[in-house]
């Protein structure tokens, strides 16, 4: 949503300072292309980071795969049972 407002704001600036309609169209087109390319770069960086994470050998990987939300409700009972010993 922020990018939409940024593009509209830049389009407004382009309209106020442009010499002709063609300049405005070219400016808007350039800004949209720039935003799309930046988004694609961010997504490719995210994909590269994920692939590195999967391919890295990490000894504590099993800890990350534990479903902590399912285990959290049982923690007080486990602590209570451990405290009775």
From Swiss-Prot:
GO cellular component, one term: extracellular region
Ranges in coiled-coil conformation: none
Propeptide feature ranges: 19-57
Cellular compartments annotated: Secreted; Target cell membrane
Broad class of where this protein is predominantly found: secreted
Annotated signal sequence range: 1-18
Tissue and organ distribution: Expressed in entodermal epithelium along the body column.
Alanine amide: residues bearing it: 82
Keywords: Amidation, Antibiotic, Antimicrobial, Immunity, Innate immunity, Membrane, Secreted, Signal, Target cell membrane, Target membrane
Described function: Antimicrobial peptide with a broad-spectrum antimicrobial activity. Keeps its antibacterial activity under a wide range of salt concentrations that mimic physiological conditions of human blood, which is surprising, since Hydra is an obligate freshwater animal with nearly no salt tolerance. Does not affect red blood cells.
Family, per entry: Belongs to the arminin family.
Name of the protein in its database record: Arminin 2c
Organism: Hydra vulgaris (Hydra)
Source organism phylogeny: Eukaryota, Metazoa, Cnidaria, Hydrozoa, Hydroidolina
